[in-house]
């Protein structure tokens, strides 16, 4: 038994064929796997990269499912070459569960003669290769101590007859690796129908791919969205609560042995909660990187109290996240105006408007170029305040000699093309408003630029986490925060103080020097005095009235 199941090999599950090809490639060592098949895919179904001769080569795969005695002709090869051109990849592949016609083979020879690298993978090739593959994935990760501890606690809770478990692990510290290992161990205990729920299609696909390295090839996986229900077969199903919601009346509450909820802070939404109240699994697992909700509701009502919490600061202290050089660039504070506004009873919104001068893009680019001098092979992610600014700033960066792609409000295929080009090194920077918050994983990012003042701690931590993942050759991540919100300053000072005083459990490493620096020391003093009276300033609403500390 393996993930290349009969419905896939017989051509009745074309989406399953796409993902099986992607899983096979990931299992054998391809990287940056992205399943892209669907409307507007420009002829590509799977994107990936692979090191070849010391160079990163990008691949695009056109997947063709056939039933009965049908064959794949040369048109599929032409579509694959069109995809190669659109996504600007080095290699194109046409893969099928069936066989190719003689004219398709002849067309391949013509294209090879013309300089294209085009490979044909037929059904026999796929089946034989998957059967001969090792049971374990090439990217199987050995668990770190804190990950192993969480897995052991969750599995022990299951063995003790408990019905639920909940853990909080910050972005970049492997919460999906933990969940996949839990699923693997519960599978071995007879839990053969596992449901993984989330709130977004891209996240469901990323979760499925995130599970692959930790599970053996015998465990089938599938996804459901676009209004389709989960499959009632053995395996791990990944999908959206929105799709599940419409099918609840026809789903046996005990259909699934285990239900795992990712980004659990979404679970209190009405539809999500209704799904979880309907389902009666043997065990419910909740996980999140960012437990805060804007409406103040608590996740403990569904998942219970967390059995473990590992914060960003914990991860940095243990050395499992990149070393951070966080620079709060507050040269835009209007100190000249401070005296005139210090006697007024201002809201946070009004204070931000009066305290911070507009930041010029040219000054931001100068500061960014200075930071790039300190990093070998700079890879930059920029968070803009608006789509209009994102597009304009990407153009300005490119014109200044830093190739940059805007990611917000572009067609999905084009965004994937740009992300692949970024992963392959064709762009040095990407610029977005919010599409990098969830479901995007770019470990090589070593410079983050914040031009946007988010009022959500959860979103801010997700954005910060984009640059914290470790990767080969990455010495540190420089964060340039062109702050324009007093709450952001408070957030970072609190995190910095935590880093100085709190080591992670069972660890003796501390961030005694902190990791945050201010371009103007007066700002840190200003916010620290304020924090004495406003302990929760970082979570305060726009309309909260503030009183200036004396002396400012």
Placement of each model-derived feature along the sequence:
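Conserved helicase ATPase core of P-loop NTP-dependent helicases/translocases
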Residues: 222-231, 391-395, 402-436
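Conserved interdomain linker/interface between the two RecA-like ATPase lobes of SF2 helicase motors
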Residues: 306-381
């Amino acid at each position: 038994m393996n993930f290349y199941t009969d419905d896939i090999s017989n051509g009745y599950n074309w989406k399953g064929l796409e993902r099986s090809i992607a899983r096979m490639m990931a299992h054998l060592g391809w990287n940056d796997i992205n399943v892209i098949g669907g409307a507007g895919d420009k002829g590509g179904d799977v994107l990936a990269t692979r090191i070849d001769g010391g160079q990163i080569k990008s691949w695009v795969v056109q997947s063709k499912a056939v039933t009965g005695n049908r064959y794949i002709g040369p048109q599929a090869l032409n579509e694959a070459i069109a995809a190669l051109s659109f996504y600007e990849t080095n290699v194109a592949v046409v893969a099928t569960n069936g066989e190719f016609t003689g004219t398709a083979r002849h067309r391949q020879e013509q294209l090879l003669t013309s300089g294209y690298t085009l490979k044909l993978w037929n059904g026999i090739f796929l089946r034989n290769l998957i059967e001969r593959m090792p049971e374990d994935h090439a990217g199987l990760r050995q668990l770190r101590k804190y990950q192993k501890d969480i897995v052991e606690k969750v599995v022990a809770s299951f063995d003790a007859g408990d019905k639920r478990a909940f853990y909080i692990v910050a972005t970049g510290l492997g919460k999906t690796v933990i969940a996949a290992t839990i699923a693997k161990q519960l599978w071995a205990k007879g839990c053969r129908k596992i449901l993984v729920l989330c709130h977004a299609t891209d996240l469901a696909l990323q979760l499925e791919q995130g599970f692959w390295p930790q599970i053996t090839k015998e465990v089938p996986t599938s996804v459901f969205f676009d209004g389709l229900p989960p499959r009632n077969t053995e395996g791990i199903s990944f999908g959206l609560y929105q799709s599940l919601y419409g099918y609840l009346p026809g789903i046996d509450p005990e259909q699934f042995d285990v239900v795992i909820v990712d980004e659990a802070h979404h679970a209190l939404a009405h539809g999500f909660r209704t799904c979880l109240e309907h389902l009666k699994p043997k065990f419910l697992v909740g996980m999140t990187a960012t437990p805060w909700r804007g409406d103040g509701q608590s996740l403990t009502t569904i998942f219970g109290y967390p059995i473990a919490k590992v914060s960003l600061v914990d991860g940095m202290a243990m050395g499992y996240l990149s070393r951070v050089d966080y620079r709060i660039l507050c040269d835009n504070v209007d100190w000249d105006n401070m005296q005139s506004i210090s006697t007024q009873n201002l809201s946070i919104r009004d204070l931000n408007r009066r305290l911070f001068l507009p930041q010029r893009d040219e000054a931001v680019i100068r500061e960014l170029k200075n930071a790039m001098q300190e990093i070998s092979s700079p890879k930059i992610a920029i968070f803009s305040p608006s789509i209009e600014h994102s597009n304009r700033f990407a153009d300005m960066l490119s014109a200044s000699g830093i190739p940059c792609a805007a990611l917000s409000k572009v067609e999905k295929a084009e965004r994937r093309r740009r992300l692949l080009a970024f992963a392959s090194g064709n762009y040095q920077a990407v610029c977005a408003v919010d599409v990098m918050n969830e479901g995007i994983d770019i470990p090589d990012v070593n410079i983050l630029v914040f031009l946007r003042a988010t009022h959500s701690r959860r979103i801010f931590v997700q954005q910060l986490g984009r640059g914290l993942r470790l990767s080969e050759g990455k010495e540190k991540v420089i964060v340039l925060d062109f702050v324009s919100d007093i709450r952001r300053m408070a957030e970072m000072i609190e995190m910095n103080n935590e880093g100085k005083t709190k080591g992670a459990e069972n660890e003796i490493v501390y961030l005694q020097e902190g990791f945050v620096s201010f371009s103007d020391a007066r700002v840190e003093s200003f916010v620290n005095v304020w924090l004495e009276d406003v302990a929760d300033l970082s979570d305060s609403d726009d309309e909260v009235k503030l009183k200036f500390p004396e002396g400012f």
